[in-house]
């Protein structure tokens, strides 16, 4: 009887300790132990890759962490090794999208200092560099940027490749256009996806499941976000 009481006491204390540990952790039981947003996760050759915005905790948009890609073989244990885009490590680096394999290379489309850029590498973990021009991120709408003219909401690129091989790029405020075969230029025809909600939106995710196209967007209102 005493052994049973002692075991019950130990079990209760272990559970209380676990609850306390979770309470002290501001991120809860996070899948990835980092302050990230705009995550895109994909499996490449048996390895899961998570590309995301790395925010400085409590800093908002004033700063961002270096671009790192978290990797895992079991979707439980995650790690990273250095930065995958060294020349952009000190820039404001957001929403890199998932890596797309095409033309024998891997492509990502991060928003750097407020503008979308196509970047290329031989491996999904990089190192990446701009697909066109020098790795310079301070001039808007140069030959290096994904868009060659000003476009409202031109941030947060998301790439979707349809069953026929056609690639599309989605970005802020519900914009979408075809991505050309070179994967670094955009078709001149740009459309806006019609939705019942008309507020400002960003951070699109687009995918196809069981024959149905699904679009997820982040909607912002003056007093709240969704």
Where are these regions (language model features)?
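Beta-propeller and closely related beta-sheet repeat lectin domains
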Residues: 37-39, 94-97, 155-158, 202-205
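Residue-level detector of Asp-centered blade-edge/turn motifs that repeat once per structural unit
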Residues: 43-46, 101-104, 161-164, 208-211
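Beta-propeller domains
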Residues: 52-80
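Asp-box/WD-like beta-propeller blade repeats and closely related beta-sheet repeat scaffolds
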Residues: 115-163
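Blade-loop segments of beta-propeller domains
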Residues: 68, 75, 79-103, 111-113
């Amino acid at each position: 009887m005493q052994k049973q009481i002692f075991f019950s006491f130990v079990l209760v204390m272990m559970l209380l300790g676990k609850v306390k540990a979770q309470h002290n952790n501001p991120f809860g039981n996070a899948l990835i132990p980092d302050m990230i947003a705009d995550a895109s996760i994909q499996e490449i050759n048996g390895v899961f890759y998570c590309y995301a915005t790395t925010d400085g905790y409590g800093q908002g948009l004033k700063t961002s962490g270096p671009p790192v890609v978290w990797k895992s073989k079991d979707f439980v244990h995650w790690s990273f090794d250095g930065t995958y885009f060294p020349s952009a490590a000190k820039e404001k680096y957001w929403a890199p999208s998932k890596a797309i394999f095409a033309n024998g290379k891997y492509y990502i489309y991060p928003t750097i200092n407020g503008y979308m850029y196509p970047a290329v590498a031989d491996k999904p973990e990089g190192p990446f560099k701009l697909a066109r021009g020098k790795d310079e991120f301070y001039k808007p709408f140069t030959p290096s940027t994904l868009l060659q003219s000003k476009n409202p909401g031109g941030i947060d690129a998301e790439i979707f490749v349809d069953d026929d091989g056609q690639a599309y790029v989605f970005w802020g405020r519900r914009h979408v256009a075809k991505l050309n075969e070179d994967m670094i230029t955009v078709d001149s025809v740009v459309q806006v996806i019609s939705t019942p909600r008309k507020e400002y939106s960003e951070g699109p995710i687009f995918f196809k499941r069981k024959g149905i196209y699904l679009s997820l967007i982040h909607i912002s209102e003056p007093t709240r976000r969704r």
